[in-house]
Amino acid sequence: MVRIRIRAIGKIKESFIRDAIADYAKRMCSFCQVECIEYPEAPVPDTHPSTIEMACVSEGEKLCSGIDSLDYVIILDRTGKQVSSEGLAEVIRRCEIEGPYQLVFIIGGPHGLSKDCLQKGNIILSLSAMTFPHQIARLLLYEQLYRAFTIIRGLPYHR
């Protein structure tokens, strides 16, 4: 059984989003072990580019600490490659077969990720060309993970 660890900046504040994420996590429990680790946003006292970059570096260090060399790291970033649900399913299927990978998804804060953090990914993906709040992006990730597992298993959820 594949293990998925989601490392994200910020907490889910809205209860309806937390409930939806919990529902998808529960649905996935027969396919994988999923865990989410949340890290606090770095303070950004002003909008000076160097202040924002320092916050991104600080957040990136937290997000990328403890990643094992065997982990398959998927970074979610607006600059990443867009893939279909079937494409994500193929990435997960390969990791299940080739193992002993743990899939690690990294979701940065509102200012994005540092260059160092981006370089630690095996692949950089974008959920959409549109911009979403990070809470919604996390919910979309859970839904797409569940959809990917149903595609892999040939279940009727994905049509």
From Swiss-Prot:
GO terms for molecular function: rRNA (pseudouridine-N3-)-methyltransferase activity. Transmembrane segments: none annotated. GO terms for cellular component: cytoplasm. It catalyses: pseudouridine(1915) in 23S rRNA + S-adenosyl-L-methionine = N(3)-methylpseudouridine(1915) in 23S rRNA + S-adenosyl-L-homocysteine + H(+). Coiled coil: none annotated. Its main location: cytoplasm. InterPro entries: Alpha/beta_knot_MTases, RlmH-like, tRNA_m1G_MTases_N. It comes from the Archaea. It is found in: Cytoplasm. Keywords: Cytoplasm, Methyltransferase, rRNA processing, S-adenosyl-L-methionine, Transferase. S-adenosyl-L-methionine binds at residues 76, 108, 127-132. Its EC number is 2.1.1.177. Belongs to the RNA methyltransferase RlmH family. Specifically methylates the pseudouridine at position 1915 (m3Psi1915) in 23S rRNA. This is Putative ribosomal RNA large subunit methyltransferase H. It comes from Methanospirillum hungatei JF-1 (strain ATCC 27890 / DSM 864 / NBRC 100397 / JF-1). The gene is rlmH.
